[in-house]
Amino acid sequence: MPELTFRNAEEKDVPLILEFIKKLADYEHRLDEVIATEEALKYWIFDKNQAEVIFALEDGKEIGFAFFFLSFSTYIANVNMHLEDLFIDPEYRGKGYGKALLRELAKIVKERGYGRFEWTCLEWNESSKEFYKSLGAEEKDWDVFHFTGQSLEDFINED
């Protein structure tokens, strides 16, 4: 039976992190939006310690990843783990690895004393929503807004 293990990413893993980001973006039909570079990932994850990555490994081979960072909740006056990306290679799905990776993250939340474990999900991704609900996660009534690129510039420079 295959063995599932986890490990924290190291600086040498930056190319692999970017590879998983692109695989996820391709799955989400958003590959054309990826402008991340190895240099930027190294800077923010390892030089500035603004995010963390954990790999899921089957028999020592990286088959998925979780990319997360901290946010803050004023209501509970505590930090939250925000899961930005979760991805398991398609050929390894259906083995419980996604659930196991989420459980590993939940353990980190508990061990570090964070207030919440949260993430977002694309509206069209019903299979992921059902998966999260089957684990007991609650869907919240929030819409996500953001400025990026030109919309950010336009807002800053608006008269």
Where on the chain are the PLM-derived regions?
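Conserved beta-strand in the GNAT
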Residues: F55, K61-L70
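Conserved acetyl-CoA-binding loop of GNAT-fold acetyltransferases
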Residues: Y114, K133-W142
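A short helix-loop-beta-strand connector motif used in the catalytic cores of GNAT acetyltransferases and
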Residues: Y43-F55, H82
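Conserved beta-strand-loop-alpha-helix junction that forms the acyl-donor binding cleft
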Residues: W119-S128, H146-Q150
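Conserved GNAT-fold acetyl-CoA-binding loop/helix
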Residues: L18-Y43
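Conserved GNAT acetyl-CoA-binding A-motif
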Residues: K110-T120
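A short beta-loop-alpha structural element at the N-terminal edge
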Residues: T5-I17
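Conserved acetyl-CoA pyrophosphate-binding loop and the N-cap/start of the following alpha-helix
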Residues: Y92, G96-E104
